């Protein structure tokens, strides 16, 4: 920086120090991402845009139906069925024992037998994934509605309920292990996604 010329009064030149005003860029950053940031009001009418019209009764009814626990559970059931079916067909495709007959180990299975086995495994996985998805989604929605908050505790509690219900078919110990395992998995997924 070039040397500053002395003032007319003969006093020493002012040095650039902490008394200097912050840069405009720093002020802008404080308002955009810093502690002076404020929530935006994104109403198009106040910004000079076209204001959005009020929602009709049909729109409100559709939104209410899509936010219901029954719709969320049905959506998770269908998604779980599709994902489980794809996963079952994939695992059957890489399994070397698909279509294998233990009575005649040297016989090569036909394409029809392999496809039948893949379909059976795909359907089995699809049903299991659909049930787990529907149970988890429904319990999480009900817990969220009951508690009135949307946080990580909802998924942990619903994971424990779902895992416990699935594991309880094999006994009390399996139910407790299923509860803990599914709750831990739900917490890990929720932590990763949020």
Curated annotation (Swiss-Prot):
Taxonomy, superkingdom: Eukaryota
SS bond partners: 69-141, 160-179
Organism: Homo sapiens (Human)
Keywords recorded for this protein, A-Z: Disease variant, Disulfide bond, Membrane, Mitochondrion, Mitochondrion inner membrane, Primary mitochondrial disease, Protein transport, Translocation, Transmembrane, Transmembrane helix, Transport
UniProt function note: Essential core component of the TIM22 complex, a complex that mediates the import and insertion of multi-pass transmembrane proteins into the mitochondrial inner membrane. In the TIM22 complex, it constitutes the voltage-activated and signal-gated channel. Forms a twin-pore translocase that uses the membrane potential as external driving force in 2 voltage-dependent steps.
GO molecular function, one term: mitochondrion targeting sequence binding
Disorder cited: Combined oxidative phosphorylation deficiency 43: An autosomal recessive mitochondrial disorder characterized by onset at birth, intrauterine growth retardation, hypotonia, myopathy, feeding difficulties associated with gastroesophageal reflux, and persistently elevated serum lactate and creatine kinase. Brain imaging shows delayed myelination. Muscle biopsy shows decreased activities of mitochondrial respiratory chain complexes I, III, and IV.
Family according to the record: Belongs to the Tim17/Tim22/Tim23 family.
PTM (free text): Disulfide bonds promote efficient assembly of the TIM22 complex.
Pfam families in UniProt: Tim17
GO cellular component: mitochondrial inner membrane; mitochondrion; TIM22 mitochondrial import inner membrane insertion complex
Quaternary structure note: Component of the TIM22 complex, whose core is composed of TIMM22, associated with peripheral protein FXC1/TIMM10B and the 70 kDa heterohexamer. In most cases, the 70 kDa complex is composed of TIMM9 and TIMM10 (TIMM10A or TIMM10B). A small fraction of the 70 kDa complex is composed of TIMM8 (TIMM8A/DDP1 or TIMM8B/DDP2) and TIMM13. The TIM22 complex also contains AGK and TIMM29. Interacts directly with TIMM9, TIMM10A and FXC1/TIMM10B. Interacts (when oxidized) with TIMM29; interaction is direct.
Protein name per UniProt: Mitochondrial import inner membrane translocase subunit Tim22
Bilayer disposition of the protein: Multi-pass membrane protein
Stored InterPro entries: TIM22
Transmembrane regions listed in the UniProt entry: 74-94, 123-143, 170-190
Location, primary (coarse class): mitochondrion
GO biological process: protein insertion into mitochondrial inner membrane
Record's subcellular location: Mitochondrion inner membrane
């Amino acid at each position: 920086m070039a040397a500053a010329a002395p003032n007319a009064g003969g006093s020493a030149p002012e040095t650039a120090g902490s008394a200097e005003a912050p840069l405009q860029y720093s002020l802008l950053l404080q308002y955009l991402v810093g502690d002076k940031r404020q929530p935006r009001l994104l109403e198009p009418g106040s910004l000079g845009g076209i204001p959005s019209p009020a929602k009709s009764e049909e729109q409100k009814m559709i939104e209410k139906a899509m936010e219901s626990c029954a719709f969320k559970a049905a959506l998770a059931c269908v998604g779980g069925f599709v994902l489980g079916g794809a996963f079952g067909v994939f695992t059957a495709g890489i399994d070397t024992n698909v279509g294998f007959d233990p009575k005649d180990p040297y016989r090569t299975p036909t394409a029809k037998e392999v496809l039948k086995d893949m379909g059976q495994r795909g359907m089995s996985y699809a049903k299991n994934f659909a049930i787990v998805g529907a149970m988890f989604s429904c319990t999480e929605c009900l817990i969220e509605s009951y508690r009135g908050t949307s946080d990580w505790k909802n998924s942990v509690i619903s994971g424990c309920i779902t895992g416990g219900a699935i594991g309880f078919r094999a006994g009390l110990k399996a139910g407790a292990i299923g509860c803990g395992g599914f709750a831990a998995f739900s917490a890990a997924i929720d932590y990763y996604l949020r």
